[in-house]
């Protein structure tokens, strides 16, 4: 599949680096953003983090580094769905309050509902225009959104549906798509 659990540079266009669950993505993104600045390139580096992933110390070291080096060409999107493989993030090791932590590390912070295309569009445009600090977009989301039996279920972390579940999921998603296209 083009969309694996951990997207691969081999199969997923636009993915420049594969990282695991240890918070390595934001560190790599810092390196890419710094490299762009040193080379005089004018582009943004985007990285996506899970709210469970930000329990890792490496994430906060990178957050501190990004601000210290003035990496205003870096945008980190935190998928805040409150679920990870073992349960809710609050039950496992709460990173809350997420926005306040990024602010304390000197970041520009935007908080949105990821289910709103308008909010996503506005946040990405604001992040692209913002100068002076790295930007964190804290995107409140629903894990498995649009598939009734997957929504808010940590048991679907890294699990593939069987044939029957796949058909049911696709029916629900296609119904949502049809509804969106009608509006």
Positions of PLM-derived features:
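Generic beta-sheet signal
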Residues: 43-47, 74, 133-139
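Glycine/aspartate-rich loop-and-adjacent alpha/beta segment that forms the canonical ThDP
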Residues: 117-183
